[in-house]
Amino acid sequence: MSKIRIIGLFLMLMLLLPLHAQEIIRGHVVDEATGEGIGFASVQYKGLNLVAITDPQGYFTIRLLKGKRLTVSVLGYKTRTVDVDGDSEKLFVSLRQDAKALKEVTVNKKRTRYSRKNNPAVELMKRVVANKKRTNLALRDYYQYTKYQKLTLALNDVDPEMLENPRFSKMPWLLEQVEVSQLTNKLILPLSVDETVTQKVYRRSPHDEKSIVKGMRSSGINDFFQTGEILNTMTKDIFTDINIYDDQVRILQHPFLSPIADGAISFYRYYIEDTLLVERDSCIHLHFLPNNQQDFGFRGDLYVLKDSSCQVKRCELILPNQTDVNFVENMKLVQEFTQLPTGEWVLSVDDMIVEMVLFDFFQKGVAIKTTRLSDYAFDEIPKQLFRGKAKSAIDPDAEMQDDTFWQQHRKVQLTKSEESMGDFLNGMQSMGGFKYVLTALKLLAENYIETGQKSKVDIGPVTSMLSNNFIDGLRTRFGGQTTANLSRHLFWKGYIARGWKSKNTYYSGEMTWSLNRKKYTPDEFPKRNISILSTYDVMSPSDKFLSSDKDNVFSSWKWAKVDKMMFYKRQKLTFEREEPWGLRTMFSAKTEENESAGNMQYFKFRTTELRAEIEYSPGALYVNSKMRRHKVNREAPIITLSHTYGIEGLLGGDYTYHYTEASVFKRFWFGSWGRIDLYTRAGVQWNQVPFPLLCMPASNLSYFSHKHMFNLINNMEFMNDRFVSVDFNWDMQGKIFNRIPLIRRLHWREYIGAKMLWGALSDKNNPYLQQNSDSKVLIAFPEQTRLMNPDIPYWEISLGIRSIFRFFQVEYVRRMNYNDNRIGPKNSVRLGFTLMF
């Protein structure tokens, strides 16, 4: 949901601009002599960065730009230029073979297939790959450099006719913000600009490297949102820095194979185009493209020095139009390498432009990232710069640098619109009705209602104000939380709720003291929090597995009747600490009274427990919303271990018990075959306890998908005191659908999944055994609860489609066994919202 809310930031200005549908050219490129379709031909508007590649049958689609000229070219054919007018929606282009280009090859009836054998382009690329180590700065004992980066987000391809609309004559601040992009020659309207100056330091032995942020500042529409850093953080993770000398290039939250990776020769096709000068260096120009245009790979050009070093001087990477990447209309990356006076070749220019479109009838967006690397040095670096295990650090004065600092370090000047961003924001605020639009979008993006310009108390979550359950019927809830505008260290959040059927009143209050200063919420990374909680409420036993609020209105729609519930009174003291390098520790003390409710029967009991948890997730990156924290970089593994000790007699605790749990999450990428997410969880209850303290399956009773939960296991259907669960999900990124002609146009993504639960109940926790008939601890299991066969794990499988209308997902789930006397359905459907590239 966090990604979906980010789109809301762009929608804010889109709502103010007239929407216009795009016209599309659907064309076919054929051989003039044979009439056969010509695959992998380049179709490009002259002078514009708008490119399409024909599919193997010669078909292509590209936006219709009236009055422009379309250039069609492919190796072995003469280039042809076509004028585009209003009648060009269906375009037929025939190309004539270039006799000069074919003079040195034998012409057969069928065109010659691409061959890697005896191919001079392939032989050159083998030398480029073999010489990669020469550019690897990590072989040096030390190195450091300064990186200046500017990231601009803007509305793209603004219609000039739209700006002539009389309604805009009253908005001079809007017209003045529109400018021509030097990269695409299109009209753009910058919405935000983010600048960062970073010092990168590296030491070979003992190995360490750090990024130290020396200066950072941001201005734009994200300033209107208290959690506006989500936009910048997510954008930087999506459009991350790359190095083509790495085998895998991660961008758009996907790994792409670099054109000079060790395995690139089998994935890409290479063609030598020409020999030319790049600046003053003689270079061989190579063109490359993926074997299959639908796979996640680049198309582009390499300029390799014409000497024994085979050093890449310049590279241009373009995402083929046929690549099944959502929301991206065009993407181009440019990297340039410079030779230092000492002889080393280093990256000096790293630019990226990504043109995006949410839907064809929405205004387009563009992200422009400009990066300059300079001040390379290889001298010994002081040890104090490597203190601590964190890979990144921010200087205390980074956000307070003056204009002198930026004039010194800004390697690329701001455009006129970027410099006047403050005037643009002031103009927006002065516009009639803007306050109401902003309030609505804040509600969509943040799920809380602010009580002032610098809100000290936020009201919400809004989606939890109305819900229903078996005990309460209609349930209303009013809650809120304080912000750092009231105190940088002390925070409170809570709610009061009313069940209109039960006539019960519920409450929750939590006070948090943060040992480090916060910008807005206490959950900001890294946590150094001490919290005390007091709650009285009603819940289903399966609610404890939900990652969202149990009162969320969307979670109230369930496929099973949840009539077995419990009242609980909970007091809890928690200390949580996070380290910048990925370690999280948590210690808590809790006392809780439980009483059965609805159709679940057991006597009231109390537990008192101490709990310790440790989690390690190296490289994890987080963003904060007002509700919770979201992990951005899902490539980071997560390893968690916890132990709970129940103490009889302490604060009225009725039982002594030990419960241990461990879990591991890891994502694996398989190139064009997509990714596999694997989550494994295991737990053991070591002592004899009543069934509410046993291991229950993580049951998802909602029609909406929830990660790492079983879709077709009912509430408390199985009882175990030891278990292992596995959640396997393979997202194939359209690998199959992209090869089905009609479905390919829908840009759907297929995925398959399987969930397994192995469980066992030891004799000491089985209330139905004769040996336990006199036990004062065990309680009879609820009706319809049963035991698992330790030799037969439970299985359910799923087949799903994501990216339906780019947002929605539908998943078919099937229960494979334990179908005798089952309570729920054997087959069902789950819905979800997923925003992915």
Where do the protein language model's features map onto the residues?
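A short, solvent-exposed loop/turn motif at the edges and junctions
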Residues: 45, 69-82
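Short, ordered, surface-exposed loop/turn motifs in non-cytosolic proteins
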Residues: 23-25, 32-47
